[in-house]
């Protein structure tokens, strides 16, 4: 019954955050029954309990459900990578299809670009793609220097792998799909020991310089509303006149944001992160 109660709470969270509609409730419960290899379900009495979808509740529910999955041998290991793969699968069941998210984003955009990004940023947190509980652990402070104040940040949102997870990732079958951790192919991907799960990840398509691009948020939030804008095709990074055209094309569409560009040198990366 505790498992059924946690399933009910997770579904109630999805309803509260409008990730699913009331018409989706039974369907969603049945999806979770399949995951946990249950053949039947009795609606538990959870009246009077705090199940309003507050962010502090979600990690607790997911932790308990993941513990149950380990106890029932649904997942074979209890390391952080395996746990993240599993709880992302759970959240993927609650996450609307890409077409639904895009439609809602564009509806908000007609009101204002800012409303559209506010919706999408909140959505990316509600689906646990951006893990609020981990982002809260990040350390940030300012240091005085002869050159002005320097922002120092220690990002703790990205979990450290334990030795077992590192060994499992090393021994995992190598794959070239998705081609990288940012590209379009990640949307909805189940993940593996050496690649994060992205069932709860959604991408907003944009037209930048007459080409298909994607817009998403970083799950690790190095900066406020830290977003990523990326080419729909895998092409080498190149800083030229067209690169500046693309930057300005984006800020014309989203004038409340600013955008930087990675260096076009191998491995260097860069952007505003340097």
Where are these regions (language model features)?
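Active-site microenvironments that recognize anionic phosphate/pyrophosphate groups
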Residues: 1-237
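Short Pro/Gly-enriched beta-strand edge/turn motifs at strand-loop
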Residues: 186-187, 258-260
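Helical scaffold of the NTase/Pol beta-like nucleotidyltransferase catalytic core
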Residues: 200-204, 235-259
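Coil-to-beta-strand transition motifs
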Residues: 222-224, 254-256, 270-271
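Histidine-centered divalent-metal-coordination microenvironment in nucleic-acid enzymes
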Residues: 226-231, 264-274
């Amino acid at each position: 019954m505790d498992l059924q109660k946690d399933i009910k709470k997770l579904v109630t969270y999805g309803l509260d955050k409008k990730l699913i509609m009331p018409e989706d409730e039974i369907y969603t419960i049945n999806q979770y029954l399949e995951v946990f290899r249950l053949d039947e379900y009795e609606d538990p009495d959870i009246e009077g309990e705090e199940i309003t979808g507050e962010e502090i509740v979600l990690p607790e529910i997911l932790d308990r459900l993941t513990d149950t999955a380990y106890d029932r041998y649904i997942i074979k290991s209890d390391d952080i990578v395996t746990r993240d793969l599993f709880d992302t699968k759970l959240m993927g069941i609650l996450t609307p299809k890409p077409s639904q998210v895009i439609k809602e984003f564009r509806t908000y955009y007609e009101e204002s670009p800012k409303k559209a990004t506010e919706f999408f940023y909140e959505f990316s947190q509600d689906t646990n793609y951006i893990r609020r509980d981990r982002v809260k652990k990040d350390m940030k402070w300012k240091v005085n220097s002869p050159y002005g104040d320097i922002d120092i940040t220690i990002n703790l949102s990205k979990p450290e792998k334990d030795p077992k997870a590192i060994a499992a990732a090393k021994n995992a079958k190598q794959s070239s799909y998705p081609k990288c951790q940012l590209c379009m192919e990640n949307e909805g991907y189940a993940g593996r020991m050496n690649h994060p799960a992205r069932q709860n990840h959604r991408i907003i398509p944009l037209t930048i310089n007459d080409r298909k691009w994607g817009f998403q948020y970083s799950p690790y939030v190095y900066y406020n509303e830290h977003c990523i804008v990326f080419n729909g095709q895998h092409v080498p990074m190149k800083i030229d006149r067209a690169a500046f055209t693309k930057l300005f094309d984006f800020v014309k569409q989203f004038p409340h944001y600013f955008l930087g560009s990675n260096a076009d040198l191998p491995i260097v990366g860069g952007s505003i992160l340097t």
